[in-house]
Curated annotation (Swiss-Prot):
PROSITE patterns: RIBOSOMAL_S12. One of its GO terms (molecular function) is structural constituent of ribosome. The gene is rpsL. SUPFAM superfamilies: Nucleic acid-binding proteins. With S4 and S5 plays an important role in translational accuracy. Part of the 30S ribosomal subunit. Contacts proteins S8 and S17. May interact with IF1 in the 30S initiation complex. Keywords: Methylation, Ribonucleoprotein, Ribosomal protein, RNA-binding, rRNA-binding, tRNA-binding. GO terms for cellular component: small ribosomal subunit. It comes from Beijerinckia indica subsp. indica (strain ATCC 9039 / DSM 1715 / NCIMB 8712). The modification 3-methylthioaspartic acid is found at residue 89. This is Small ribosomal subunit protein uS12. InterPro entries: NA-bd_OB-fold (IPR012340), Ribosomal_uS12 (IPR006032), Ribosomal_uS12_bac (IPR005679). The lineage of its organism: Bacteria, Pseudomonadati, Pseudomonadota, Alphaproteobacteria, Hyphomicrobiales. Pfam families: Ribosom_S12_S23. GO terms for biological process: translation.
Length: 123
């Protein structure tokens, strides 16, 4: 416990808050261009081939974004929109790619939670 004179000499400092999606620069979404589209495997108890893309954002940052849903049409040079939101079992993946926006198509034959996957209302 510091004395009063020690606190006068060197006051307490507020702990710096670490942003979760810092490359978005306080924006809800950002546009970017895919530089590499590939699959990766998740952390220990899980097993799958998760689809991810390395994206160069308009502000110059390069981030890894997760491609949600079944099947996608992304390839190198596709223009995508990303949002914040990490994938718990993929280290380093802190962003999601939005489906149904710009070059990314929505998920086909999606009946529930369609707005999350950019799917149109079925007839």
């Amino acid at each position: 416990m510091p004395t009063i004179s020690q606190l006068i000499r060197k006051p307490r400092h507020e702990k710096a808050y670490r942003e979760k999606a810092r490359h978005l620069e306080a924006c809800p979404q950002k546009r970017g261009v895919c530089t590499r589209v590939y699959t990766t495997t998740p952390k220990k108890p899980n097993s799958a081939l998760r689809k991810v893309a390395k994206v160069r954002l308009t502000n110059g940052f390069e981030v890894i974004g997760y491609i949600p849903g079944e099947g996608h049409n992304l390839q190198e040079h596709s223009v995508v929109m990303i949002r914040g939101g990490r994938v718990k079992d993929l280290p380093g993946v802190r962003y999601h790619i939005l489906r149904g926006v710009l070059d990314t198509q929505g998920v086909k034959n999606r009946k529930q939670r369609r707005s999350k996957y950019g799917a149109k209302r079925p007839k």
